[in-house]
Amino acid sequence: MNFLNFSILIFAYLLGSINSAIIVCYIFRLPSPRSVGSGNPGTTNVLRIGGKVLAAITLIFDILKGLVPVVIAKVLTGNDFITACTALYAILGHIFPIFFGFKGGKGVATLIGTLFGFSWILGLIFVITWLCVAIITRYSSLSALVATVIASFSVIFTSDLQVAAPFLIIAIIILVKHKGNIQRLISGQESKIGDKAKAKNDSN
């Protein structure tokens, strides 16, 4: 691995480690998302704490954290494997941020950014899958999980297995981070879209 590739991966991880939920709440003098609600520093908890506008800001930044480094890797290296690894490092930064004690969000919004950066088709697959599952089931968490798996595995059909591997790892990590959501889905206790927010049901 040359210095450029190494630098891009480190940049992706460090950018991913900037937790927008925590920063947005700090700037607007709101309680830390790590100490209220679900305790998850992600968009859903910011929505609960600060409302739709601040949640939208958080969501946009989380998406950009995945999009920007992947686009940079794609343009500067022209190497699909390095670009896919860059996506993985951005997700690792978001979920295990060095700046916040390695305790971050669940990675779904950042994954959306990496998918669109890698291939707009993959990003579109994620969005369409999410919408279809959400309309049918009204479960935001289930929509995110199904979209994550389908979009990540779709890389296999557009690239070789080496390039797909980082995205498959991402899917596994995100599934593990949603273990609580999966348990509630199985037990029928997961909240649906439009239900009154429940502190433990964050999907992002």
Swiss-Prot record:
It is a multi-pass membrane protein. The keyword Lipid biosynthesis applies. Coiled coil: none annotated. Belongs to the PlsY family. The chain crosses the membrane at residues 8-28, 53-73, 81-101, 116-136, 155-175. This is Glycerol-3-phosphate acyltransferase. The lineage of its organism: Bacteria, Pseudomonadati, Pseudomonadota, Gammaproteobacteria, Thiotrichales. The gene is plsY. It is an enzyme of class 2 (transferase). It comes from Francisella tularensis subsp. holarctica (strain OSU18). One of its GO terms (cellular component) is plasma membrane.
